[in-house]
Amino acid sequence: MTIFDNYEVWFVIGSQHLYGAETLRQVTQHAEHVVNALNTEAKLPCKLVLKPLGTSPDEITAICRDANYDDRCAGLVVWLHTFSPAKMWINGLSILNKPLLQFHTQFNAALPWDSIDMDFMNLNQTAHGGREFGFIGARMRQQHAVVTGHWQDKEAHTRIGAWMRQAVSKQDTRQLKVCRFGDNMREVAVTDGDKVAAQIKFGFSVNTWAVGDLVQVVNSIGDGDINALIDEYESSYTLTPATRIHGDKRQNVREAARIELGMKRFLEQGGFHAFTTTFEDLHGLKQLPGLAVQRLMQQGYGFAGEGDWKTAALLRIMKVMSTGLQGGTSFMEDYTYHFEKGNDLVLGSHMLEVCPSIAVEEKPILDVQHLGIGGKEDPARLIFNTQTGPAIVASLIDLGDRYRLLVNCIDTVKTPHSLPKLPVANALWKAQPDLPTASEAWILAGGAHHTVFSHALDLNDMRQFAEIHDIEIAVIDNDTRLPAFKDALRWNEVYYGLKR
């Protein structure tokens, strides 16, 4: 069972009584056929639920009102099978607070050249019914998605499925609770921000709990639970000699297991699905949570270090969006560069906390090594390299008057040399279009040093995320040129200033 099983998307057909009972009967019949086929064959993440025809203002408004108050409804897919005068939709759309997609399709794929008549034309009017619906959306300044294509087309299926992921993610975000264990890293700017504005814009709440509250739960964990979790470590990872039974760091592994169990219990009891820690606020914990955080991220929790609640929330959101897709999603940080003409590289990592969902297939190494930052006992961590291939890194920043999402398309590459003295998980990539352009654009746009790294999602997913939340997006990819990028930032400043 996944998070998508908790939601459904309503399929709404727009028409009108002008065409008579027989036409409306055929519209209903077609709608039932399409919905059944999509649910059976399209591999959509959510179930489509067909609602009664929308043929009058009252019917349409009732559907929109019901959608708002049904917690299982993640959004609406609207098909204008016939012409549906858009003034009928104004009241409903004005109150609708769920994501909306127009599926611009028709029942038949090919025109029946020899038999087409006006009855056929009146029944199959998506071509201009969809335009009428589009006008009222533009007139009302209502953000909605449009997918054009025949309902049997696999590309249309893929695009609807991707939108469904966004719709479910938005509903989950409205319920998301982010727990900050301690505060932000002292004097750091980008990890701070307006938590009230974030809740107004996205819906997630951010609050702080004292590390002592967590420590109390951690200390309540019994040896039996710890032993069971250690057995799981033994079967899932390759343990270094120091971390095995009778190894000199075995107790550190047990303490890491205690912290993991305590953190998970605390998060479950509080209904949290994202959290932060900071190495400056660990009072009562024997080690910086490394292994615990890595494993919790792999289970779907959002996380970021140094109190960075925006990145923690974004990671959770992107974890939900990518549920069931191939490839992983992780907290990440641009750490250091390899400058080589024509082969500039970025080595990404963090002190400990990189999610194993992005790891290569072989078992990660479980090790305990010294960590100078934090002043605690040596922490346990998983060490691995990352899968290769196309990926993205994304950052959500608070500009005071608005939020900006930055996305850099990257190409993850194999590490050309072993890293015997680097005791942390890492990813190596080439930034698009090149490191100088990507880094300068990122810096000029104010992108954070913390990011969410994903093999599972792509630029189109993040564009949809920005659209569905009505926030600015700045894209850095192979098409980026710095003069045009700077111009876009200036234009956005004017646009969002006027929009306020």
Swiss-Prot record:
Domain of life, source organism:
Bacteria
Q: Does the keyword Metal-binding apply?
A: yes
Per the record, its GO cellular-component terms are:
cytosol
Tell me the route in metabolism or biology where this protein functions: Carbohydrate degradation; L-arabinose degradation via L-ribulose; D-xylulose 5-phosphate from L-arabinose (bacterial route): step 1/3
Example GO BP:
L-arabinose catabolic process to xylulose 5-phosphate
The record describes how the cofactor is bound as: Binds 1 Mn(2+) ion per subunit.
According to UniProt, the name of this protein is L-arabinose isomerase
Q: Which organism is it from?
A: Salmonella paratyphi B (strain ATCC BAA-1250 / SPB7)
